[in-house]
Amino acid sequence: MMRMDGQAQRPKVLRRIITAGMLASCLAVAAGSQNFKDPTEGVRPDADFQIARIMYATNARAGSRGIAQPMWAVDYPGAEEHFLAALRRYTNVDTAEDTRHLALTDERLFQYPYIWIQQPGYWYPTEKEVAALREYLLRGGFLMLDDFHGRDWGEFENAISRVFPDRELMDIPKDDPAMQIFFDIDQRTQIPGDRHLRYGGQVQMEGPPEWKGIYDDDHRLMVIANYNMDIGDAWEHADDPGYPLPMTAFAYQLGINYVLYALTH
């Protein structure tokens, strides 16, 4: 079972020490990550917490390290391997060592409190998927969206507005519980993708970072959208000496906060 051992109540100074320690151990976390099983296997989660990455129909492909995958699978499996290793290292959450890939219409969806859509600029959900996601979120689920930039916003906004036509995408304030539950996220540093750091700087970020969210009637955060950021890349490249460790550490902090919020709200 998930235990936080009072860490959410620790003073800011101590949490800053934890943050500094995270910088020193990012590579150790990456080196200690596990090999994944077939992500479509299994009827139930393997532990109290297991990430479910959402599959969606797309012909577009992208990736790094010479591997091109469907847009929903970009950064797999390195992102999950490294992040789940960090989650196990810094919390007492009972965390599975593998992940799941599910369609929104999969009946197993409701067994996973935290789901992830990567590259939502290429996400065009069907009516059945829209209905399933709305029900999932209103029944207590949590959705993170990551790695979309610039003009991707319009496609994402069209999709998410079909899920919640009556709810506004709002700026997530720094004092939101999701930003303070474990680490105090009082900075808004932009997390670049690997492609933004290579090629002689020719690939530029397409705007400032934005944290957008959708809340339910009790002001529970159901959706977090990391716009003009690439948290998945920061996780994936934790073992890459060419990717800045401070960015990976910050991405770990965000992800850990999101997970703990999803499990406790």
Question: Where would I find each of the regions flagged by the language model?
Answer:
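An acidic, glycine-rich "communication" segment
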Residues: 59-65, 150-237, 252, 256
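A generic secondary-structure signal for well-formed alpha-helical elements
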Residues: 91, 141, 163-167, 262
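Surface-exposed patches in mature extracellular/periplasmic domains of secreted proteins
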Residues: 92-103, 145-149, 167-175
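Short alpha-beta junction capping motif
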Residues: 51, 109, 114-155
